[in-house]
Amino acid sequence: MIRSRDAVYARPDLPKLKHSLGRVEMSLAGALEPRRVLVADNDPLTSRMLSEIAEKEGYQVVSVSDGREAYRTLMADADFRIAIFNMTMPNLRGLDIVRYMKTEKRLMRIPVLVVSGDPGLKQMADSFAAGATMFLPKPLTQDQLQRTLRIALASREAKRQFPHAA
């Protein structure tokens, strides 16, 4: 079991992207894009904390309380910079939504952060296998989430600038 409180786990391909970030300049289109994040967590306290931290980072937050609501939200509106899903939610699991997102062209560009109260290696591996960009064990710290949002956004911009890299 992983016990580091400040741990942020990223897919293996992210270090390559992180390395090239110094050369990435945000495009005008990227700068004008709304900074929206979808937060889906069935725990009201965690959802509120995630939303408040994202808002402090300048994001507009759309918050839902279960997987089915997250799915419906994405079907109606795919204009999110980042999605944060609890691994296990009622009605539809976070990992099931991630798998679906990776099959839809309009959704696959959205980086997904999976949060879990169970920080085991299996949960982390399952998250990455489903297509998550990052895995965050609970309890989360404000600093940890802020850093993660910045890395995920930079990763997305790098992929936009260099679509055939990594």
Language-model features: where?
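Charged docking surfaces used in two-component/phosphorelay signaling
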Residues: R48-K56
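Acidic catalytic/metal-coordinating carboxylates
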Residues: S65-E69, N86, R93-R99
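C-terminal output helix
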Residues: L140-R150
